[in-house]
């Protein structure tokens, strides 16, 4: 908001918790129009419907920031297809669906929140590493097409997101991800 954002469309699978709702209200108090649309980014038709509906009374879409993700860590031989899909769906499928949706818009930015796991390949996080490697490659693909793209390889966030749980932080720390 301090840098000029006046309209924000947030996609989420669920309603915000109290602390998150307070942050959204703070943005509104600063003069930002905040619209929350419930949709799973891995469901392309639900995603398109949510975005198209929201944009009917909003300015054109200019930037996409993809932050979705989840963890389901285990050794590769213990991961079945459903556990792999659980991690790939929000990150990889969601990113691809956002990419396809973005082709209908003149974007200034397409930002993907990836992880250092994509190139460190930590033990027990093969599905998560693969999902994040997809984000990195999607950014390269978009750049090859002349489209905006940036993939940021984050470490663990201590106070928010998937790794905020102490058990996850300890696991990531043992793997050298800080």
What is the role of each PLM region?
Residues 1-178:
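4′-phosphopantetheine-dependent carrier domains
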């Amino acid at each position: 908001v301090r840098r000029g954002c006046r309209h924000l469309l947030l996609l989420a699978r669920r309603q915000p918790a109290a602390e998150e709702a307070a942050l959204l209200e703070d943005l509104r108090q600063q003069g930002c129009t905040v619209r929350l649309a419930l949709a799973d980014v891995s469901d392309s038709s639900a995603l398109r419907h949510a975005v198209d509906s929201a944009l009917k009374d909003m300015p054109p879409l200019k930037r996409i920031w993809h932050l979705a993700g989840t963890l389901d860590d285990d050794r590769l031989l213990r991961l079945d297809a459903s556990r792999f899909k659980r991690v790939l769906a929000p990150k990889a499928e969601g990113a691809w669906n956002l990419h396809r949706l973005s082709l209908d818009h003149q974007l200034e930015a397409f930002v993907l929140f990836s992880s250092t796991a994509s190139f460190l390949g930590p033990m027990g996080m093969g599905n998560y590493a693969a999902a994040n490697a997809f984000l990195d490659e999607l950014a390269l693909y978009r750049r090859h097409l002349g489209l905006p793209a940036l993939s940021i390889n984050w470490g663990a966030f201590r106070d928010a997101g998937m790794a905020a749980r102490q058990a996850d932080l300890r696991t990531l720390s043992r793997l050298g991800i800080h």
